[in-house]
From Swiss-Prot:
The keyword Ribonucleoprotein applies. This is Small ribosomal subunit protein uS11. InterPro entries: Ribosomal_uS11 (IPR001971), Ribosomal_uS11_bac-type (IPR019981), Ribosomal_uS11_CS (IPR018102), Ribosomal_uS11_sf (IPR036967). Part of the 30S ribosomal subunit. Interacts with proteins S7 and S18. Binds to IF-3. Belongs to the universal ribosomal protein uS11 family. Residues 115-134 are annotated as: Disordered. The lineage of its organism: Bacteria, Bacillati, Mycoplasmatota, Mycoplasmoidales, Metamycoplasmataceae. NCBIfam families: PRK05309.1, uS11_bact. GO terms for molecular function: rRNA binding; structural constituent of ribosome. Located on the platform of the 30S subunit, it bridges several disparate RNA helices of the 16S rRNA. Forms part of the Shine-Dalgarno cleft in the 70S ribosome. One of its GO terms (cellular component) is ribonucleoprotein complex. Keywords: Ribonucleoprotein, Ribosomal protein, RNA-binding, rRNA-binding. It comes from Mycoplasma mobile (strain ATCC 43663 / 163K / NCTC 11711).
Length: 134
C-alpha cells in the first residue's frame, strides 16, 4: 500500500514592515482590503466574501468593517504601524473601511482616491430595473 503524503501548511514568514499602503477596492457587490509594502508587494488581505458573507450582505458597510479588521490583524503581525490609504470604487464600504483602519490603531498618513474615471471610453452597462412589487 502506498503511503499517503499530507501537505503541511507553510509557515508564514514574518516581515518587518512599518510603513505600507492600504488598498481599499469597494464595488457595488463586495469590498476588498489589501495591505502592501511601498513597492506594491501584498502581505495581508481580506474581503467581505472571504470572511463568510454571501450575496447582498457582502456590500454592506458592516461587512467592509469586518473585512478590514481581519486584514489589519494580519498586517499587524508583520509589524505595520502607518499606512497611506488608496480608495478605489464607488461602493458603500469605502468610508467604513477607512474609519476601521484608524480605529484599530494604524496611523493614516495620506488618503487618496484612485477611482478610474473614463474619458468617454466604452459604453457603460445598462441600468438595473427596479420594479415596485405590490
Amino acid at each position: 500500500m502506498a503511503v499517503k503524503k499530507t501537505k503541511s501548511k507553510q509557515k508564514v514568514k514574518r516581515k518587518n514592515i512599518v510603513s505600507g499602503v492600504a488598498h481599499i477596492h469597494s464595488t457595488h457587490q463586495n469590498t476588498i482590503v489589501a495591505f502592501s509594502d511601498e513597492a506594491g508587494n501584498v502581505f495581508a488581505w481580506s474581503s467581505a466574501g472571504a470572511i463568510g458573507y454571501k450575496g447582498t450582505k457582502k456590500k454592506t458597510p458592516y461587512a467592509a468593517g469586518l473585512a478590514t479588521t481581519a486584514a489589519v490583524e494580519k498586517a499587524k503581525e508583520h509589524g505595520l504601524k502607518e499606512v497611506r490609504v488608496e480608495l478605489k470604487g464607488t461602493g458603500s464600504g469605502k468610508d467604513a473601511a477607512r474609519k476601521q483602519i484608524e480605529a484599530l490603531g494604524i496611523i493614516i498618513k495620506e488618503v487618496k482616491d484612485v477611482t478610474p474615471i473614463p474619458h468617454n471610453g466604452t459604453r457603460p452597462p445598462k441600468k438595473v430595473l427596479k420594479r415596485d412589487l405590490k
